[in-house]
């Protein structure tokens, strides 16, 4: 089945799509799959239920939910915020409230550095300002349902929106949060703005959370604390001093009932300013230079000018959110991480005679791997075909890089089952080829020692090898 919900706001830009096409497929690992898309005639639309448009409802109420097996979405009737309910286990459900807000950028009038390209420094005399109208406007919400997905969308004023999607037949229960922000208005008040999406869960986290380090080890964080020096900055900079970079994963820890996990499709700043909350900065527009060398404010516009009336940039991105028991958290966020950080690569071409192509079998997926080549705790970082001069025996050769996804016992990312050492047979990645030699490499490609076709990876280990074929 497929669906064609309208594209999300804000106001249309030149050349911007007005409709989305969504459909559900199964893609084998490292494979090439071909799909044919065409417009149906009115008669075909009437006869074809598989390509029916998603139903749309306006002014969703408290009873409007997107039903997934373990995830449902509704709207708070009091303020219109999005509520995502997760079934953690038989005894506990966790509800995450999604809101959007902005911090006013500090202008540096106190003699210290202003907020800018290299510095996040909000005006600490003000709390984050919620986006949207003071009273909930039901017309600002939309609900779409189809056999493929259920989507609830809320507009926060006229320059920000959030859509939450749940997909049918999902192996790892989670919700997809698509945020769209911009153009950020600064003309009326002359104040720069730092826009966040906030997730409030009610978990008793005791000021603790964790973020990834370059997508690998999870680093414990504690509010208003540093392990190796006395922290004295909490009262002056309570927000920015508790922000950390995360390129992939942030997770709330400390509550024995559940963990809440946030995954991003790009590097962002994240903080847990209050217990049970995570907030990610998604967009910024500053009006002051931060005195750190650029010599201009981070005031990006659609025209590329800064001293002009052109509107600011529109940014769009995706978060994945999930809630689990503490024990199953690492396996959930590591699997979602591989999806978020390694999206499917898309290519498009105009096709003539598509019916003949379908009958000829060109829809069939072509996969490089043998079934089950990579264990669940191993990620294939890359496979590269090497030039002939790098192949000592004059034949074909390739470089493969493998990474263990889980951490050792005692670490945040430890999983009782999947943190065990993983054994991989390189021959499974090259079905139909005969391996004659294996050489272990550094990650930069320098030879280390002769290797073996069977490779063992310890927790968090990354290994590279050159494989030569007969």
Tell me what each language-model feature is.
Residues 1-470:
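C-terminal (or distal) subdomains of carbohydrate-active enzymes
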């Amino acid at each position: 089945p497929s669906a064609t919900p309208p594209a999300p706001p804000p106001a249309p830009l030149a050349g911007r799509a007005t409709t989305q096409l969504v459909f559900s497929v199964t893609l084998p690992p490292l494979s090439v799959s071909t799909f044919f898309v065409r417009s149906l005639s009115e008669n075909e639309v009437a006869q074809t239920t598989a390509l029916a448009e998603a139903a749309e409802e306006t002014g969703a109420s408290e009873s409007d939910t997107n039903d997934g097996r373990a995830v449902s979405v509704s709207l708070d009737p009091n303020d219109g915020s999005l509520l995502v309910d997760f079934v953690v286990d038989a005894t506990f459900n966790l509800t995450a409230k999604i809101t959007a807000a902005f911090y006013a950028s500090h202008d540096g009038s106190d003699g210290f550095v202003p907020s800018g390209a290299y510095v996040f420094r909000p005006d600490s005399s003000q709390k984050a300002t919620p986006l949207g109208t003071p009273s909930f406007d039901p017309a600002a919400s939309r609900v779409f349902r189809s056999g493929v997905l259920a989507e609830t969308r809320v507009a926060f004023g006229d320059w920000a929106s959030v859509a939450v999607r749940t997909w049918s037949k999902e192996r790892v229960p989670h919700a997809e949060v698509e945020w769209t922000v911009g153009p950020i208005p600064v003309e009326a008040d002359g104040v720069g703005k730092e826009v966040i999406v906030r997730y409030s869960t009610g978990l008793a986290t005791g000021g603790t959370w964790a973020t990834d380090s370059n997508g690998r080890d999870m680093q414990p964080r504690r509010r208003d604390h540093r392990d190796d020096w006395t922290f004295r900055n909490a009262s002056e900079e309570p927000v920015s001093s508790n922000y950390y970079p995360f390129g992939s994963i942030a997770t709330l820890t400390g509550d024995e009932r559940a963990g809440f996990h946030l995954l991003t499709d790009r590097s962002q700043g994240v903080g847990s300013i209050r217990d049970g909350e995570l907030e990610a900065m998604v967009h910024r527009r500053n009006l002051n230079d931060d005195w750190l060398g650029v010599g201009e404010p981070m005031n990006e516009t659609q025209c590329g000018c800064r001293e002009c009336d052109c509107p600011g940039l529109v940014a769009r991105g995706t978060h994945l959110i999930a809630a689990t028991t503490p024990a199953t958290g690492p396996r959930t966020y590591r699997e979602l991480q591989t999806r978020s950080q390694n999206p499917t690569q898309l290519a498009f071409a105009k096709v003539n005679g598509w019916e003949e192509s379908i009958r000829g079998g060109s829809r069939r997926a072509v996969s490089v791997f043998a079934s089950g080549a990579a264990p669940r705790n191993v990620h294939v970082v890359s496979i590269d075909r090497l030039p002939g001069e790098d192949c000592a025996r004059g034949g074909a050769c390739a470089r493969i890089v493998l990474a263990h996804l889980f951490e050792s016992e005692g670490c945040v990312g430890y999983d009782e089952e999947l943190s065990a050492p993983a054994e991989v047979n390189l021959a499974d990645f090259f079905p139909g080829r005969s391996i004659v030699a294996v050489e272990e490499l550094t990650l930069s490609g320098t030879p280390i020692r002769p290797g073996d076709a069977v490779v063992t990876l310890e927790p968090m280990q990354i290994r590279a090898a050159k494989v030569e074929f007969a």
